[in-house]
Swiss-Prot record:
The gene is nar1. [4Fe-4S] cluster 1 binds at residues 20, 62, 65, 68. The keyword 4Fe-4S applies. Component of the cytosolic Fe/S protein assembly machinery. Required for maturation of extramitochondrial Fe/S proteins. May play a role in the transfer of pre-assembled Fe/S clusters to target apoproteins. GO terms for molecular function: 4 iron, 4 sulfur cluster binding; iron-sulfur cluster binding; metal ion binding. This is Cytosolic Fe-S cluster assembly factor nar1. The keyword 4Fe-4S applies. InterPro entries: Cytosolic_Fe-S_CAF, Fe_hydrogenase, Fe_hydrogenase_lsu_C. It comes from the Eukaryota. Transmembrane segments: none annotated. GO terms for biological process: iron-sulfur cluster assembly. Belongs to the NARF family. Keywords: 4Fe-4S, Iron, Iron-sulfur, Metal-binding.
């Protein structure tokens, strides 16, 4: 779905229509009165209407609408972009920090400036892989390029009104590891409760880290929502941890901490705008250092994609390959809390990425390996589904047989099959009855037998779902092969490439080869010597999970907020306004207005 979300090649955008919650109203244009005949009367049918102005649709409008998912998301491209990043850096000076034996603290002189901000960023591993494939560098070198751009002296800090840059840049892999551990706990608790605990998702638990999939489920298939994992995504969890701990330890309001996320997917812009992912959900009511209750502050202020990262550098006249050779690696100040500093900037990974973990974070793989560690002697067996984006896994024990079953579904073509399997029996009967009316008796019997067989085979404990075919390395915001060619040509010549020329469109074979190159960079992320040395001490998966639990509980104790409010979120059905009385539509508009729309 996300692969087509750009201003250049969007081909399914639906303009506001008669049933839109925000219709366009046109009034008759005023006709100049003729001085020679002041008594002339013009009938209404002869008055030409004014050309309607373009509809102004805000992010909240998208969340309140149940129309086409991709049409709503297309609006986000202009709302969160490299321009917002540059405008924010130019509008606010960077708050200065002091480092001494006591640790990192805020410079009192800098704190007097109400316009000052602390800028932090989080970057996904898929972004680094795409950048590495583009410039033919290692994943480690791609990481250095991003650090130099966002925080180095030759990057964003070299220009702008205030010379502002990002104080810390963290790897979302760190937060992914926390989500992996909590996911295994969630699956284990759900299986143990046998659907008796309403606070837990229903079996099968379906991953909720992909915002495109979540938005689709909320708007079109609300019966999926009880199955969705209640955990925040790594992006959202990073935002919560950074803003909560920096606000607490440095004594600054949450509103003065600005968090940028660099992601492979346009849908992450929509996720960052969810009202559930603001400081209101985790802030103590009596907190004096936090934002006011009536002004929710997003955990993630802005999301840009990998392609937009190139545009960000280009807008400041920065050549990404050249800044790699200009200076050494960026040194970030110590995080204000020692325990969290050790965690956020640790080089030891919970699990290395491989073909088995997939390209989307390895949620399913960690669930399997976690259960395998609790069942010594068990074995993971994989079986390919109807295509490469569907894989079924079983954890089997020689003594007890099958322990758990799980599956991976990537791409909306396969997601449709998953949705049909998750439909409640009543809905399946209703939809099936309508289809069967058009079929003959033999065809109906064959269809019923196939559906019955599918139902009997569907007994998964966990399903990893991603909207993009091939997973997150193929996200819609990733650098395409034609973008890579243009970026390299620009780097070689020093001038922007001519995009008006007749550039050849890459063939399907070239596109597959390009994606394989990005995947290779993604899987090579843990091969560097530094990380190998840091991981030389062997830790079992259960020991590493215990370490993650320890740091999460430490964070909860530091904030005085239960982990259920810090690491978990909620989802809700988005109801359609089509056919509702106008009062209902106005209520939606008023609710959106309260959330800060441009209406």
């Amino acid at each position: 779905m996300s692969a087509i979300l750009s201003a250049d090649d969007l081909n399914d955008f639906i303009s506001p229509g008669v049933a839109c919650i925000k219709p366009i109203e046109s009034l008759p244009s005023k006709q100049p009165q003729k001085s020679d005949n002041p008594y002339e009367v013009t009938t209404e049918d002869k008055v030409q209407a004014e050309n309607p102005t373009p509809a102004q649709i805000s992010l909240t409008d998208c969340l309140a609408c149940s129309g086409c998912v991709t049409s709503a998301e297309a609006v986000l491209i202009s709302l969160q972009s490299h321009t917002e990043v540059l405008n924010t850096l130019d509008a606010h000076p960077e708050l200065r920090l002091i480092q001494n034996e006591q640790g990192t603290s805020l410079d009192p002189r800098s704190a007097q400036d109400d316009e000052g901000r602390i800028f932090v960023a989080s970057v996904s591993p898929q972004v680094r892989a795409s950048l590495a494939a583009t410039y033919g560098v290692s994943e480690k070198e791609a990481t250095s390029i991003i650090h130099q751009l966002l925080s180095g002296p030759h990057g964003l800090r070299a220009g702008g009104k205030h010379g502002s840059g990002f104080t810390w840049v963290i790897d979302t892999n760190i937060m992914r590891e926390a989500v992996l551990v909590l996911t295994a706990d969630e699956v284990s608790d759900t299986l143990a409760s046998e659907a008796k605990d309403p606070s837990l998702p229903k079996k099968p638990i379906v991953s909720s880290a992909c915002p495109g999939w979540v938005c689709y489920a909320e708007k079109t298939h609300p019966f999926i929502l009880p199955h969705l994992s209640k955990l925040k995504s790594p992006q959202a969890l990073a935002g919560t941890l950074l803003k909560s701990t920096l606000s607490k330890t440095l004594g600054v309001p949450v509103s003065r901490i600005w968090h940028l996320a660099v992601m492979p997917c346009f849908d992450k812009k929509l996720e960052a705008s969810r009202e559930e992912l603001t400081d209101v959900t985790w802030n103590p009511a009596d907190g004096q250092m936090f934002s006011q209750p009536q002004t929710p502050v997003r955990d993630v202020d802005c999301v840009i994609t990998t392609r937009e990262l190139l545009t960000l550098a280009s807008a400041r006249g920065i050549s990404l390959p050249s800044i790699l050779s200009k200076s050494s690696s960026v040194s970030f100040p110590s995080f204000p809390d020692k325990a969290l500093d050790d965690y956020l900037f640790s080089k030891r990974s919970l699990s290395a990425q491989s073909m088995m973990t997939g390209t989307s974070g390895g949620y399913l793989h960690h669930v399997l390996t976690s259960f395998q560690a609790r069942n010594p002697g068990s074995e993971i067996v994989a079986e390919r589904g109807r295509n490469a984006d569907v894989v079924v896994y079983k954890l089997v024990s020689p003594e007890n047989g099958s322990i758990i079953e799980a599956a991976r579904y990537y791409g909306f073509r396969n997601i449709q099959n998953l949705v049909n399997k998750l439909k409640p029996p009543e809905m399946s009967k209703l939809s099936g009855a309508r289809r069967n009316d058009a079929l003959g008796g033999k065809a109906r019997m064959q269809l019923s037998s196939r559906k019955a067989a599918a139902k009997t085979k569907f007994d998964y404990a966990y399903v990893e779902v991603m909207a993009c075919p091939g997973g997150c390395t193929n996200g819609g915001g990733q650098i395409r092969i034609e973008d890579a060619r243009e970026a390299n040509l620009t780097a070689q010549t020093g001038t922007p490439a001519d995009t008006n020329g007749a550039a050849s469109k890459p063939s399907p074979h070239e596109q597959r080869a390009w994606l394989a190159r990005v995947d290779e960079a993604y899987f090579s992320a843990g091969d560097s010597e530094d990380e190998t040395e840091a991981s030389s001490k062997h830790f079992s998966i259960l020991e590493r999970e215990a370490g993650i639990h320890q740091i999460l509980h430490y964070w909860s104790d530091l904030m005085g907020v239960p982990l259920s409010k810090l690491a978990y979120t909620t989802f809700r059905e988005v109801e359609s306004d089509v056919g509702k009385p106008q009062e209902g539509v106005n209520a939606t508009a008023q609710a959106a207005l309260r959330e800060g729309t441009n209406w």
